[in-house]
């Protein structure tokens, strides 16, 4: 699949890397569909895509053309079309997530003013509001974050699918950040092609209902690259920001304000020592 170029303007220039990534992923997905399903299926996907774009841009005749194309498909013939657009949407969302990370890094590298939602901006606002050191310490001493994690009743994505999407995200980040040799760029693009091929060969829906313990195990499997990696980073960022806010807090040991029984269960399931906190 390919993506139509967006209008070029100064206001959209910062979105150029996002458009580049989406075009890359769309091109790889299109190549995958052509190699796995045949040229005729690829051409049908392209017809639907281009006609849908025309309809979105206000060409009313495209509506009847699109209806005619889709109405002529059997249920079996519709499946690769649905899968193509579903996976393209997933890949585009992955690229957009990476773009948000990219923009945040660029702001940090440029030394931009703290942005909404950051700890540093919150501390600046507390300082302007006249909140002193004692009040800050009291806040962190009594603060409590206790997430409640549940299996979403409409979440149907398989772990294998989510794992491949995470792999694509990692490869996009590597492609974006590293100064690569031509050979290394080829390796990254080849890895992207393998990940997207695996994604295409993976059924979108589970054929069997998960047991409760399987849902729990699946949920805990994501802790390695969410809570267990990000929590130490968050505490370090908090302590660094507090020291910047007030030098008297340089040696301040931030209290443990994050509690979660699922985290404790994850440690215990590995045989790791874990306190009640």
Describe the function of each predicted region.
Residues 1-277:
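Often metal-dependent polyanion-binding catalytic scaffolds in large enzymes
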């Amino acid at each position: 699949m390919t993506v139509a170029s967006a209008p070029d303007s100064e206001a959209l220039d910062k979105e150029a890397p996002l458009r580049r990534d989406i075009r890359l992923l769309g091109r790889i997905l299109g190549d995958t569909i052509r190699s796995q399903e045949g040229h005729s299926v690829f051409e049908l996907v392209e017809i639907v895509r281009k006609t849908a774009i025309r309809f979105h841009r206000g060409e009313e005749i495209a509506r009847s053309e699109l209806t005619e194309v889709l109405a002529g498909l059997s249920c079996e013939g519709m499946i690769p079309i649905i899968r193509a657009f579903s996976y393209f949407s997933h890949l585009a969302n992955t690229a957009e997530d990476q773009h948000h990370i990219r923009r945040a890094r660029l702001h940090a590298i440029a030394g931009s003013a703290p942005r909404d939602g950051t700890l540093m901006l919150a501390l600046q606002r507390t300082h302007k509001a006249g909140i002193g050191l004692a009040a800050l310490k009291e806040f962190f001493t009594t603060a409590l974050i206790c997430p409640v994690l549940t299996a979403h009743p409409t979440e149907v994505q398989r772990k294998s699918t989510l794992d491949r999407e995470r792999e694509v995200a990692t490869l996009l980040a590597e492609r974006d950040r590293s100064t690569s040799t031509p050979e290394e760029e080829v390796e990254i693009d080849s890895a992207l092609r393998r990940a997207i091929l695996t994604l295409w060969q993976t059924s979108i829906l589970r054929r069997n209902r998960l047991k409760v313990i399987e849902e729990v195990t699946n949920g805990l499997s994501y802790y390695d690259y969410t809570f267990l990696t990000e929590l130490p980073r968050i505490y370090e960022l908090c302590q660094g920001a507090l020291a910047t806010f007030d030098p008297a807090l340089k040696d301040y040991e931030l209290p443990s304000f994050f509690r979660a029984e699922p985290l404790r269960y994850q440690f215990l399931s590995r045989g790791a020592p874990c306190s009640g906190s």
